A protein has these predicted regions:
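Conserved alpha-helical segments that form or flank metal/cofactor-binding pockets of metalloenzymes
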Residues: 20-24, 81, 86-114, 180-185
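Acidic/His metal-coordination segments adjacent to aromatic residues that form catalytic metal sites
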Residues: 34-54, 114-140, 157, 190-194, ...
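Helix-loop segments that flank and shape redox-cofactor active sites
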Residues: 40-45, 63-85, 147-162
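Alpha-helical scaffold segments that form or flank carboxylate-/histidine-based iron centers
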Residues: 45-56, 74-93, 136, 161-173, ...
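Internal, conserved structured core segments that host functional sites
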Residues: 126-179
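Glycine- and acidic-residue-rich phosphate-binding/metal-coordinating active-site segment common to enzymes
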Residues: 157-208
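Extended, helix-rich structural scaffolds rather than catalytic motifs
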Residues: 196-327
Length: 327
């Protein structure tokens, strides 16, 4: 009887049932019950997740480029093997996340094409060049360190497939962060030229790493709704503060300095206070006018076009396999 009533309400666009569904959804959110693909969800919730998961997936895929650029120039065979494994992990993370996005009813090819067309974004950090080997260590340490702060909270996001993907991704990102810090430690204990190279990399990546958490909460158009639906668990400013508190002691342990003259430790609050982020630079990069924006998208478009035959072959093989099973 209930199923028949639900069907009638759906066919007649019965508003009462819609309210009941929304109330049930909000109740599940309040009770910390994961929302699964087969569950009813508001269209705005679905669209918000597609945007966030899609951008997260794009970031993993585009993030392979600045590091992949150094695979052939790694200083030792050990470093090369580590970097190869890391870039391979990033590709896997992108695939997990595209699969999670597909559970929301979107097509992987569609959201990927939107990224290539500039209609979907990826993390601003990957629009900065990697100029030295120290940059690779600093990306692992600072950039993946910032990602971990963000992503550990996402292990408890309200959408089940996203949360489960994040559990695996966070384990691998922790390895990446430790690998990056170990590479930076080796440079910090090396020659004066190596130490200067490390400090230069920190100087260039410190502020972009802070920008990874997004705009201040007051200026973030999506944060309030994402927090209410528990897609996000913490605001951008709180996560950014956690990263600074975690990372400044690590910088000092390496004998390096944070490129922020306003940085100080506040005894009363127990937090580090840091200077104002250059939000104009953030806006420029996020809107496609960064140092490497054009280069990154050009590389991805080239790979997409040259890889068309692989996708076609895989599809043809899948169709043959399906036909055999049906027969």
């Amino acid at each position: 009887v209930i199923q028949h009533y639900a069907l009638i309400c759906k066919l007649t666009n019965h508003k009462g049932d819609d309210v009941t569904q929304e109330q049930r959804f909000e109740q599940r959110i309040a009770q910390e019950t994961a929302i699964e693909p087969q569950d009813w969800m508001p269209d705005a919730y679905r669209k918000t997740l597609i945007r966030q998961i899609g951008q997260h997936a794009h970031s993993e895929i585009v993030g392979m480029l600045p590091e992949g650029n150094w695979i052939t120039r790694a200083p030792t065979l050990r470093r090369k093997a580590i970097l190869l494994a890391k870039v391979q992990d990033e590709a896997g993370h992108g695939l997990y996340l595209y699969s999670a996005a597909e559970t929301l009813g979107c097509a992987r090819e569609d959201i990927y094409q939107k990224m290539l067309d500039g209609r979907m974004k990826y993390s601003s950090i990957f629009n900065y060049p990697t100029l030295s080997w120290a940059d690779i260590g600093v990306i692992g340490w600072l950039v993946d360190g910032a990602a971990i702060v963000n992503q550990v909270a996402l292990c408890r996001t309200s959408y089940g497939p996203y949360a489960r993907a994040m559990v695996k991704i966070c384990k691998e990102e922790s390895f990446h962060q430790r690998q990056g810090f170990e590479a930076c430690m080796a440079l910090a204990q090396g020659s004066e030229a190596q130490r200067q190279m490390l400090q230069d990399a920190i100087n260039r990546f410190w502020w972009p790493a802070l920008m990874m958490f997004g705009p201040n909460d007051d200026n973030s158009p999506n944060s309030a709704r994402s927090l209410a639906w528990k897609i996000k668990r913490f605001g951008n400013d709180e996560l950014r503060q956690r990263f600074v508190d975690n990372t400044v002691p690590q910088v000092e342990m390496l004998g390096m300095t944070v490129p922020d003259p306003d940085l100080r430790f506040d005894e009363e609050s127990g937090h580090y206070r840091f200077g104002e982020i250059d939000w104009q630079e953030f806006d420029e990069v996020i809107n496609g006018r960064g140092i490497c924006n054009h280069e990154r998208l050009a590389a991805k478009r080239k790979a997409w076009e040259e890889g068309a035959w692989v996708r076609e072959a895989a599809l043809a093989h899948a169709e043959k396999q399906h036909a055999r099973k049906v027969a």
